[in-house]
Curated annotation (Swiss-Prot):
This is Transcriptional regulator MntR. Pfam families: Fe_dep_repr_C (PF02742), Fe_dep_repress (PF01325). GO terms for molecular function: DNA binding; DNA-binding transcription factor activity; protein dimerization activity; transition metal ion binding. It contains an N-terminal DNA-binding domain and a metal-binding domain. It comes from Escherichia coli O157:H7.
Length: 155
């Protein structure tokens, strides 16, 4: 039987979840947004030290596209959290906890990026999309991405 013009097709309707699930979902998103900047900064500091031997505020500002005062404010926050040490005239260094967080963030990024590549996403888009997605997926989802990538072959 053919469908008449103007007749809507059947669509799956998303059901509104109960209030507790809704609250928990938004709480997780807020927490991911809060951690996103922290993860990005410690990962960048680690990358700069590894690639150029030092992490300077001016370099971080240039790479993040923000002002130096914005970087300085975040660095104070990271120092208060015990993730970095700022040594005058020498630069910024990660504590053991900061390096651990940078490594975890780097691994999350790589898992998401590899998954996107296996799906056929172009390398440049996969890299950019992974940068945002890595902060918003659960460990369960990361495990599924990792398993899928292993099963279907990393490109």
């Amino acid at each position: 039987m053919s469908r008449r013009a103007g007749t809507p097709t059947a669509k799956k309707v998303t059901q509104l979840v109960n209030e507790e699930e809704h609250v928990e979902g938004f709480r997780q998103v807020r927490e991911a947004h809060r951690r996103e900047l922290i993860d990005d900064y410690v990962e960048l500091i680690s990358d700069l030290i590894r690639e150029v031997g030092e992490a300077r505020q001016v370099d971080m500002a240039a790479r993040l596209g923000v002002s130096q005062p914005t970087v300085a404010k975040m660095l104070k926050r990271l120092a208060t959290m015990g993730l970095i040490e700022m040594i005058p005239w020498r630069g910024v260094f990660l504590t053991a906890e900061g390096e651990k967080l940078a490594q975890e963030s780097r691994e999350r990024h790589q898992i998401v990026e590899n998954f996107l590549l296996v799906l056929g996403v172009s390398p440049e888009i996969a890299r950019r999309d992974a940068e945002g997605m890595e902060h918003h997926v659960s460990e369960e989802t990361l495990d599924a991405f990792r398993l899928f990538t292993q099963k279907h072959g990393a490109k």
